[in-house]
Regions:
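Conserved N-terminal beta1-alpha1 strand-loop-helix module at the mouth
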Residues: 1-205
Length: 205
């Protein structure tokens, strides 16, 4: 299973995730998020992460100029579009930066299949998240039954994921590639190294 741990703000937690075989590490560039980090902070936090790991900048409705800066000034190798970005904008980014991997977060709502169909040719990995007017990060799960309709689509399950929920999902036989986890590896809003290690050990062994 592919594991993305998201919302990092300190190097110790990142090091724990890397040592325990995380597949992707996410940084939130959305200023309204409690897990927000600046471009300067991402530059510092990301520089020692191996490039074999997806180093993800989670972006919400950025301009191309802002994306240029992120890619130029940090070690990111993946962009996760988490806003209202159009297919044509993502195509433009992909053409300009063919070496950058593209994730797209989509809400688990009635438009899910339509949205996947629209984006699938330009996206490497989808994240299916809890619907929210505030662009994700709710820490709340949704009704996973909607995922039964997804076949031959690379996607991670997001939205309040923790070890207990992974155990529930394992019995449901979805065709998912893995999980996107943030609040599930935190204690009192801070990344918890023991929770990171426990979750990655459980999934990876």
């Amino acid at each position: 299973m592919f594991i993305k741990c998201c919302g990092f703000q300190d190097k110790d937690a990142i090091e724990t995730a890397v040592l325990n075989h995380v597949d992707a590490i996410g940084f939130i560039t959305y200023p309204k998020s409690k897990r927000y980090v600046s471009v300067e902070e991402i530059k510092s936090l990301s520089k020692d992460i191996p490039q074999t790991i997806d180093i993800v900048a989670v972006v919400v409705n950025l301009t191309m100029v802002e994306i240029d800066q992120l890619i130029r000034e940090t070690s990111i190798n993946t962009l996760q579009f988490h806003g209202d970005e159009s297919v044509s904008f993502i195509q433009e980014v992909k053409e300009k930066y063919p070496h950058i991997k593209i994730y797209k977060a989509l809400p688990a709502n009635d438009q899910l299949l339509t949205n996947i169909e629209a984006f699938k040719n330009d996206v490497d990995l989808f994240l299916i998240d809890t619907p929210s007017k505030d662009y994700g990060g709710t820490g709340v799960s949704y009704n996973w039954s909607i995922l039964n309709a997804l076949n031959n689509i690379p996607y991670l399950i997001a939205g309040g994921i923790n070890i207990d929920k992974i155990k529930q999902i394992e019995s449901l036989n979805f065709n998912h590639n893995g999980y996107d986890i943030s609040s599930g590896i935190e204690t009192n809003g801070q990344k918890d190294k023991e929770k990171i290690k426990a979750l990655l050990t459980y999934v990876k062994e």
